[in-house]
Amino acid sequence: MLDYNIMAKSSFKLKILYGEGDAEILASQADSIQKAGHQVTTVVGRRALEQALKTDAFDLVLLGPTLTRNDRHHLPYMVKKAHQGTRVLVMHADGGRHPYVDVATDTGRSIESILETIASMMAQEKLVTAQ
């Protein structure tokens, strides 16, 4: 089990845009991400996510498994077009590698596993920028 207090004290706090197709799943997952110390903006559906990208910039965009397959395919392009440096994590991989997705996870991974993936991704990025 992930210790949220340790995660909250990490050296980075990300500004995350998290989109799902299901509001209940979105609420429970977003709560866990906030407890890990990140600032989370939540949206339900593709149009709301597109609108959020027009009004603000984010460090990371999470595309949840309850978004449609079509949305999970097209939204990474839209994210990178709006903000090239924003990282994209798709929480339900459909197989092949998407050129605009920075990290993809398999279906059914726990939120703790997703948080570990985010921490690992950011630690790698920190190492690269420090060189």
Language-model segments: which ranges?
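Non-catalytic signal-transmission and effector/linker regions of two-component phosphorelay proteins
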Residues: 1-21, 32, 109-131
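Short, hydrophobic beta-strand segments that form beta-sheet elements in well-ordered domains
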Residues: 17, 41-42, 87-92
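Two-component/phosphorelay signaling modules centered on CheY-like receiver
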Residues: 22-41
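Acidic phosphotransfer microenvironment of two-component signaling modules
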Residues: 23, 44-48, 109
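Acidic, metal-coordinating helix/loop segments flanking the phosphotransfer/catalytic sites
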Residues: 42-60
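Conserved phosphotransfer cores of two-component systems
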Residues: 54-56, 79-85, 95
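Conserved phosphotransfer microenvironments
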Residues: 61-83
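Alpha4 helix (beta4-alpha4-beta5 surface) of REC/receiver domains from two-component response regulators
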Residues: 69, 74, 89-116
